[in-house]
From Swiss-Prot:
Family: Belongs to the BPG-independent phosphoglycerate mutase family. A-PGAM subfamily.
Keywords linked to the UniProt accession: Glycolysis, Isomerase
Organism: Archaeoglobus fulgidus (strain ATCC 49558 / DSM 4304 / JCM 9628 / NBRC 100126 / VC-16)
CDD domains: iPGM_like (cd16011)
HAMAP family named among the record's database cross-references: ApgM_A (MF_01402_A)
Catalysed reactions listed for this entry: (2R)-2-phosphoglycerate = (2R)-3-phosphoglycerate
Main function: Catalyzes the interconversion of 2-phosphoglycerate and 3-phosphoglycerate.
Protein name, as recorded: 2,3-bisphosphoglycerate-independent phosphoglycerate mutase 2
E.C. no: 5.4.2.12
NCBIfam families assigned: apgM (TIGR00306), hyp_Hser_kinase (TIGR02535), PRK04200.1 (NF003242)
Lineage: Archaea, Methanobacteriati, Methanobacteriota, Archaeoglobi, Archaeoglobales
GO molecular function, one term: metal ion binding
GN (gene name): apgM2
Top EC class, one word: isomerase
Pfam families: Metalloenzyme (PF01676), PhosphMutase (PF10143)
This protein's pathway: Carbohydrate degradation; glycolysis; pyruvate from D-glyceraldehyde 3-phosphate: step 3/5
Length: 380
């Protein structure tokens, strides 16, 4: 038996007035996800434990069976695992645009990987402290490493949570480390405009010390592989001892290389027992707050990812679990911690006929703790 986990990041949503009171998932034409729901069994999953922010890090770790209450240290350190970066403290470091004290773009104008690398090189040339170092990632998603002993109880805010809001109310807080971060942010605001017109400030957040995750193969007795468009999931996979499969031409947006993602997923499924395909585009559109574009993004995912994979895998010998990690409602343009709809193909059927937030609530699994999902997928 093969196991395929499909995670369309941020797909779940709320009812939207401009969509006649329906969710983007309800409006979108999704015959392939509907097939999985009709031929499988459904439920809703709590992927964000109480007391945690609804980040993709927490939610995806939970889906993969990792108890974040024991193993989570921050988003930055997980992304560092993806790049082989080590340090005492690691922060995710966005390139952002701020105007008149307001966060207007958390993604640095979707800066290209190449331009972002040049920006990071210049930041390292001009950095004010030797114990500070920047590492380039993908597009606006970069890292800040601080190799000095600080208490790591600083409070930071994800920039995608404060789009359109004043940054003064959301700056780092919590002692000496917070003061350093604010100093670096102010310093970057002075030099970034000389380097690029896409971003005018760095925004460090999600920092912590390097984590230790349970080994996937040892725990489940399966050879696992991860295909993803973002460093975060690559870091989770590497931290769990899973193979990471690279795909050329991916963008983390709705213009991504769908064909390459499908090809490499199908190939990985031939060589491994368990494969995760995590895509980012739907979540990005949710952060933009565009309901119609989110409908389109979901339809692209259904036709170009799910539909193509259904034609490539042996459905008699493959179990498929499909769910977003968290909702990203277009109304609020950020993540929320509500349960997400899931469908599990290959473990019996229920009465659900379509894959939506509402229909999955009527599924036979009901409300499930996200930590149970892996057992539901792979148990005999």
């Amino acid at each position: 038996m093969k196991y395929l986990l499909l995670i369309p990041d941020g797909m779940a949503d709320w009812e939207v007035e401009e969509l006649d009171g329906r969710t983007p998932l309800e409006v979108a034409e999704t015959e392939n996800m509907d097939f999985l729901a009709k031929e499988g069994a459904c439920g809703i999953a709590k992927t964000v434990p109480d007391g945690f922010e609804p980040g993709s890090d927490v939610a995806n770790l939970t889906i993969l069976g990792v108890d974040v209450r024991k193993h989570y240290t921050g988003r930055g350190p997980i992304e560092a695992l993806a790049r082989g970066v080590k340090g005492k403290l690691v922060f995710r470091c966005n390139l952002v645009k701020v105007e008149d004290g307001v966060m207007v773009d958390y993604s640095g104008g979707r800066i290209s990987d190449e331009e972002a690398r040049k920006v990071i090189e210049e930041l390292n040339r001009a950095k004010p402290y030797d114990f500070v170092k920047f590492y380039a990632g993908k597009s606006y998603r970069n890292l800040l490493v601080i190799n000095k002993d600080f208490r790591d109880d600083v409070k930071t805010f994800p920039p995608h949570d404060i789009t359109g809001k004043e940054i003064d109310k959301h700056l780092p807080s919590g002692g000496e480390l917070a003061e350093l971060l604010k100093e670096l942010m102010g310093w970057s605001a002075e030099i970034l405009p000389e380097i690029t017109d896409k971003a005018n400030m760095i925004w460090p957040w999600g920092g912590g010390r390097m984590p230790s995750f349970p080994n996937f193969g040892q725990r489940y007795g399966l050879r696992g592989a991860m295909i993803t468009e973002v460093d975060l999931l690559e870091g989770i996979a590497r931290g769990m001892g899973m193979e990471v499969v690279q795909v050329e031409g991916i963008t983390g947006y709705i213009d991504t290389n769908y064909r390459g993602l499908v090809r490499e997923t199908a190939r990985a499924l031939e060589e491994h027992d368990f494969v995760v395909l995590h895509t980012e585009g739907i979540d990005e559109v949710g952060h933009e707050g565009d309901a119609e574009l989110k409908v389109r993004a979901i339809e692209l995912y259904d036709s170009k990812i799910v539909g193509k994979l259904l034609n490539k895998v042996d459905l008699d010998e493959t179990r498929i679990l499909l769910l977003p990690d968290h909702p990203t409602p277009v109304k609020v343009k950020t993540h929320v911690a509500e349960p997400v709809p899931f469908t599990l193909y290959g473990r019996g059927r229920d009465e659900v006929k379509v894959y939506t937030e509402k229909s999955c609530r009527r599924g036979k699994f009901g409300l499930v703790d996200g930590l149970r999902l892996m057992d539901l997928l792979i148990k005999k």
